[in-house]
From Swiss-Prot:
It holds the Pfam family tRNA-synt_1g. InterPro entries: aa-tRNA-synth_I_CS, aa-tRNA-synth_Ia, Leu-tRNA-ligase, Leu_tRNA-synth_edit, M/V/L/I-tRNA-synth_anticd-bd, Methionyl/Leucyl_tRNA_Synth, Rossmann-like_a/b/a_fold, tRNAsynth_Ia_anticodon-bd. One of its GO terms (molecular function) is leucine-tRNA ligase activity. Gene3D superfamilies: HUPs, Isoleucyl-tRNA Synthetase, Domain 1, Valyl/Leucyl/Isoleucyl-tRNA synthetase, editing domain. Keywords: Aminoacyl-tRNA synthetase, ATP-binding, Cytoplasm, Ligase, Nucleotide-binding, Protein biosynthesis. This is Leucine--tRNA ligase. A motif ('HIGH' region) lies at residues 41-51. It is found in: Cytoplasm. CDD domains: Anticodon_Ia_Leu_BEm (cd07958), LeuRS_core (cd00812).
Length: 873
């Protein structure tokens, strides 16, 4: 008997698929189409088990849909621009282009052995000039359509690397790479008008029925719709031109609890004061050393500077509130100015307590009296409270009712107007980096900002750049930077900022429909292939990537690059769980000198401190024991961290190439699909991989045995046909419902049924061929081997998906338990319509019943049709 040897067979079938062009996507109007797409990877150079799981999921769907008669598009590309390539060039020498394309080649070589049903003819990288040139063409179209504009904006500036940092790249107020204190600097930036679509993007979430509820909620919260009041305080002692201070509040019902007003350090009033007051200038400079994100401001100590300016309360002009510049107010939300109600906002409470400001409560819990507060009272808006300083609505009402009543009251009195605001800000895309898509505009002293002529696209990145000096190499590349104005022909300068890499990934799904087109999309191909029917990726992309893609589809539709039906580009979204693994580490305590800044007064500079040094170890260096783990080389006992996300830092990574080399691609695919529901994390274990390999070997041996079997039909043929029909129905349901683990569980069960069946040889071969078809999406190489062994025609990858005979799904057999003197002793399976007298004969012939009777006859034998048989001795 031959043995299961994936190393000898898997590459052969991959070559056969390539030769037959099995996975080439074909525009075929006579067939329904299905577009399945996994979020394309960043070319880091190595694939990991998370990639294996993600792309196997998409592959299972793509293969099953192709077998079911769909024309399938299942492409692959590379999200290839970005900082890591540029940082690699700085740290190791070389060029980002070489580093990126080298990594792409490495990852492609690692992915192909997985046997994915990808149409590699459509492959592209976002750093290909053919791709980013079309992106530049769309930029110009969107600029002319008013979807893009330029303005000054406050950004995180790294003074060492001389670049803008994203909020997440600012760690404890310092640049993630340079460790230099970050500055808030105002720069001219390019923006997409995504905020114009905030209401539409929010409202349309309700129509995305096949998206996870969690993702829709995360996007809704990010868009952040709020209903509030915008009004103006009149000012006292303010500079000329600042006689009013516009504020926006979502809690106008708390106006009578206001004890101060606060403005952003970037507010026009703060900027005016900064130019004329050294104290203000010093405070604003301190504020600018904090990142620009809400998270950074939330973590920072709340500080304020009393400007000496006062504002009059709109309902009591005798009451004047101090105006502070506060480090926690964002200029780009609302008006950049707020009033503080410390009794009902914890941040305002801490601020008022710090600066000795009044804390008058506006409402109290229902049934309680007004009392001094030790912390802010912040009930849910839906909770009923008693208003002690209310001015609109009932005395006892919910916060929601009170806000609506307050807006109506204020509007009736001419104090402001009700406004719907959104947390979503316009999307700033300017990056002071080399390795990105150049922004295709030219700055001319005569004509101003001029788009590059489309016939000159792509504006290619120059190759002759160096990274030995901080900052953007494009700024110091005169032969690239200096150009002529396409409008007047005068000397001009190119825009040296490049686009945020999120732009690259916001439309790649559309480019896959016609990746070689000389326009961003081909109308005919986009009409046929769009939308993406099934999108697969991690929950970490729930907000930015998916939200930007939804906006971009609208912008592309407005500029004629996508059909109206593609305004929501992804019909269904699935967010898969992670692949996890135990982590192993050893620790050692060492005595080291105390850092000088930590020494107590009078303490010796030679003072030592105990420092724990932790060393992580790769799984292949570790041997598991009954009570833990040891290091193979030394026997040292190790600490074990329960299964956690695979990461290079913890060294708990499993190299897919090692798994493929040891067990084959099908084992890796089977295991990551079988052990857990796909939306949950799956723990990778060596024992689990070995068990998967053993099962696939068992399937191989079973197929080999059945292929060589001989024998006439038997009475069990029909039962096996029924089991086959059920397997078809349940595996199909599992795949279509993204319950891959349930589909695989059914295949385990079907294997057991087939191995135990006493059916005839031809019935078994028929069932085994069906098994090959059913397991083909999960383990395509083994499926081809089994299909070939059993005489299947052509490739199983091209065979139509099996259909269950409805008649065989109707179970006309019933299993009746046999009770002897009230205790269950046996069972008998009979046709549902079998006569009771015939059932009695089968029961009396049962071995367990015969042993109990010891040659005698039962006192009673009662058959309850379809339910039970009672034997009384």
């Amino acid at each position: 008997m031959s043995r299961y040897d994936p190393a000898a067979t898997e590459s052969r079938w991959q070559a056969a698929w390539d030769e037959a062009g099995v996975f080439t996507a074909r525009h075929d109007p006579s067939r329904p189409k299905y577009y399945v797409l996994e979020m394309f990877p960043y070319p880091s150079g190595r694939i990991h088990m998370g990639h294996v799981r993600n792309y196997t999921m998409g592959d299972v769907v793509a293969r099953q849909k192709a077998a079911a008669g769909y024309s399938v598009l299942h492409p692959m590309g590379w999200d290839a621009f970005g900082m890591p390539a540029e940082n690699a060039a700085m740290e190791r020498g070389g060029h980002p282009k070489d580093w990126t394309y080298g990594n792409i080649a490495d990852m492609r070589a690692q992915m192909k052995p997985l046997g994915l049903s990808i149409d590699w003819s459509r492959e592209f990288a976002t750093c290909d000039p053919e791709y980013y040139g079309q992106q530049q063409a769309m930029f110009i179209d969107m600029l002319e359509a008013g979807l893009i504009y330029r303005k000054n904006a406050v950004v995180n500036w790294d003074p060492v690397d001389m670049t803008v940092l994203a909020n997440e790249q600012v760690i404890d107020g310092k640049g993630w790479r340079s460790n230099a204190p970050v500055e808030r600097r105002e720069l001219t930036q390019w923006f997409f008008r995504i905020s114009d679509y905030a209401g539409e993007l929010l409202e349309a979430l309700d129509r995305l029925k096949d998206w996870p509820e969690k993702v829709r909620l995360m996007q809704a919260n990010w868009i952040g719709q709020s209903r509030g009041l915008q009004f103006a305080f009149s000012t006292v002692n303010a500079p000329e031109g600042f006689d009013r201070l516009e504020v926006y509040t979502t809690r106008p019902d708390t106006l009578l609890g206001a004890s101060f007003a606060a403005i952003s350090p970037d507010h026009p009033l703060a900027k005016h004061l900064e130019r004329h007051d050294a104290g203000v200038a010093e405070f604003v400079a301190e504020c600018r050393r904090v990142g620009t994100s809400e998270e950074a401001l939330e973590k920072a100590e709340k500080k304020g500077f009393d400007t000496g300016i006062r504002v009059r309360h709109p309902f009591d002009t005798a009451l004047e509130l101090p105006v502070y510049i506060a480090n926690f107010i964002l200029m780009d939300y609302g008006t950049g100015a707020i009033f503080g109600c410390p009794a009902h906002d914890q941040r305002d409470f801490e601020f008022a307590s710090k600066y000795g400001l009044p804390i008058p409560p506006v409402f109290v819990a229902e049934g309680t009296e007004e009392a001094p507060l030790t912390e802010a009272f912040v009930p849910m808006k839906s909770e009923r409270v008693a208003y002690v300083r209310g001015f609109a609505g009932a005395e006892i009402q919910t916060g929601e009712e009170a806000v609506a009543a307050a807006i109506d009251f204020c509007e009736s009195k001419g104090v402001g107007r009700g406004v719907t605001n959104y947390r979503l800000r316009d999307w700033g895309i300017s990056r002071q980096r080399y390795w990105g898509c150049p922004i295709p505009v030219i700055h001319c002293e005569t004509c101003g900002v001029v788009p590059e002529a489309k016939e000159n696209l792509p504006v290619r990145l120059p190759d002759d750049v160096t990274f030995d000096v901080p900052g953007n190499p494009l700024d110091r590349h005169p032969t690239w930077r200096d150009c002529t104005c396409p409008k007047c022909g005068a000397k001009a300068r190119r825009e040296t900022d490049t686009m945020d890499t999120f732009v690259d990934s916001s439309w790649y799904y559309a480019r896959f429909t016609a990746p070689r087109a000389t326009t961003p999309t081909d109308p005919e191909e986009a009409e046929y292939w769009m939308n993406v029917d099934q999108y697969i990726g991690g929950i970490e992309h729930a907000i930015l990537h998916l939200l930007y893609s939804r906006f971009f589809a609208r912008a592309m539709q407005k500029t004629g690059h996508l059909p109206a039906k593609a305004i929501e580009p992804f019909n269904a979204l699935f967010t898969q769980g992670m692949v996890t693994h135990e982590a192993y580490y050893s620790e050692e305590a060492k005595q080291e000198p105390v850092w000088q800044g930590m020494l107590e007064p009078g303490e010796s500079p030679d003072t030592q401190m105990t420092v724990r040094h932790i060393t992580y170890h790769f799984p292949e260096e570790v041997e598991r024991t009954e009570d833990g783990a040891i290091l193979k080389t030394t026997g040292q006992k190790l600490k074990v961290i329960p299964s956690t996300k695979m990461s290079k830092s913890k060294k708990n990574v499993v190299d897919p190439m090692n798994i493929i080399s040891q067990f084959g691609a099908d084992t890796a695919r089977w295991f990551v699909m079988s052990d857990s529901p796909p939306e949950r994390d799956v723990e990778w274990t060596a024992s689990g991989a070995e068990a998967a390999f053993k099962h696939l070997g068992r399937v191989w041996r079973l197929a080999d045995e059945i292929a060589r079997a001989e024998g006439a039909p038997t009475a069990e043929d029909v039962a096996l046909d029924r089991a086959t029909a059920k397997a078809i129905a349940e595996v199909t349901q599992g795949i279509e419902g993204f319950a891959f683990n349930k589909a695989i569980a059914k295949l385990y069960e079907f294997t057991n049924t087939l191995s135990r069946s006493g059916a005839g040889a031809e019935a078994k071969r028929r069932a085994m061929r069906t098994m090959a078809q059913l397991m083909s999406p999960m383990v395509p190489h083994l499926a081809e081997e089994v299909w070939s062994m059993l005489g299947g025609e052509g490739l199983v990858a091209q065979a139509p998906w099996p259909k269950a005979d409805p008649a065989l799904l109707v179970d006309d057999m019933v299993t009746l338990p046999i009770q002897i003197n009230g205790k269950r002793r046996a069972e008998v399976t009979v046709p549902k319509d079998m006569a009771a007298s015939e059932v009695e004969k089968l029961v009396l012939a049962d071995e367990a019943v015969q042993r109990a009777l010891s040659g005698g006859a039962p006192k009673k034998l009662i058959v309850v049709p379809g339910r039970i048989v009672n034997v009384v001795i």
